[in-house]
Amino acid sequence: MSFMDQIPGGGNYPKLPVECLPNFPIQPSLTFRGRNDSHKLKNFISEIMLNMSMISWPNDASRIVYCRRHLLNPAAQWANDFVQEQGILEITFDTFIQGLYQHFYKPPDINKIFNAITQLSEAKLGIERLNQRFRKIWDRMPPDFMTEKAAIMTYTRLLTKETYNIVRMHKPETLKDAMEEAYQTTALTERFFPGFELDADGDTIIGATTHLQEEYDSDYDSEDNLTQNRYVHTVRTRRSYNKPMSNHRNRRNNNASREECIKNRLCFYCKKEGHRLNECRARKASSNRS
């Protein structure tokens, strides 16, 4: 008897989730890997539970299989081992979720998060890379840990004096507004990036940027240790997935960087010629929809 034949519903069980999904109104937008994404686990579980509440499931086994479809290694390998250890006929969905949470969740280390933030600056990174890094680190902050005003102050301290003054002049009410204002300000004036010079028409062009590109290529760390140290038994498996570094490089190859946009006189938003960011129709249409 195969492993799947032991599931209530017999050998036809693996087809069950596929038959249910066409009537499923929402699909989880998240996946959980179990490596350096502990801060995403609560949202992942909440979204899984929300989607499951919209249709009826015949048994706990079907709910477990649905959740496992959104796990990547090493979390996927852990789920396979956990189900076999507990027994497919005895394990409940609540037990599975509780085991997933206890095994992979690590409380964020606030001191490490703030130390990582203080290492950032617009002068060193430029506004685009500053925002990218800041978002990545800030996402690990516990929800409602500080007020919106305190969050804005934390971010604006990383800006150059010129950008800081312009952002504060517009009095942003949310962190998102402050980051957007800093981005728009730099994109419109094009005067806060080192290595730029003006051509005969007064437009900004790029000077030698080889060293900047080399620094950008080494911009991504393989480990983001911003959680409290805690012993976790991890099952060692062969990697059957793409390395994170490859994903970042592919993304840079597919999307024009900020420097390339300036060099080729492209819009920062739609990457097309003939207009600037504040004139982009696609960007305005997207803002109206949201």
Curated annotation (Swiss-Prot):
Task: Identify a single GO molecular function assigned to this protein.
Answer: DNA binding
Please indicate which residues carry the site annotation Cleavage. Answer: G207, A208, H233, T234
> What's the domain of life for this entry?
Eukaryota
What SMART domains would the database entry show? ZnF_C2HC
A GO cellular component term found in this entry reads: retrotransposon nucleocapsid
Residues found modified as N-acetylserine:
S2
Keyword annotations from UniProtKB, A to Z: Acetylation, Cytoplasm, Metal-binding, Transposable element, Zinc, Zinc-finger
What is a biological process (GO) this protein takes part in?
Answer: viral translational frameshifting
Q: Which InterPro entries match?
A: Ty3_capsid (IPR045358), Znf_CCHC (IPR001878), Znf_CCHC_sf (IPR036875)
Q: What is its main location?
A: cytoplasm
Cell location: Cytoplasm
Zn finger spans (CCHC-type): 265-282
Stored Pfam families: Ty3_capsid
Domain remark in the UniProt entry: The N-terminal domain of NC, but not its zinc finger, is required for nucleoprotein complex formation and its chaperone activities.
Q: What does this protein do?
A: Capsid protein (CA) is the structural component of the virus-like particle (VLP), forming the shell that encapsulates the retrotransposons dimeric RNA genome. Nucleocapsid protein p9 (NC) forms the nucleocore that coats the retro-elements dimeric RNA. Binds these RNAs through its zinc fingers. Promotes primer tRNA(i)-Met annealing to the multipartite primer-binding site (PBS), dimerization of Ty3 RNA and initiation of reverse transcription.
Misc. remarks from the entry: Retrotransposons are mobile genetic entities that are able to replicate via an RNA intermediate and a reverse transcription step. In contrast to retroviruses, retrotransposons are non-infectious, lack an envelope and remain intracellular. Ty3 retrotransposons belong to the gypsy-like elements (metaviridae).
Q: What is this protein called?
A: Transposon Ty3-I Gag polyprotein
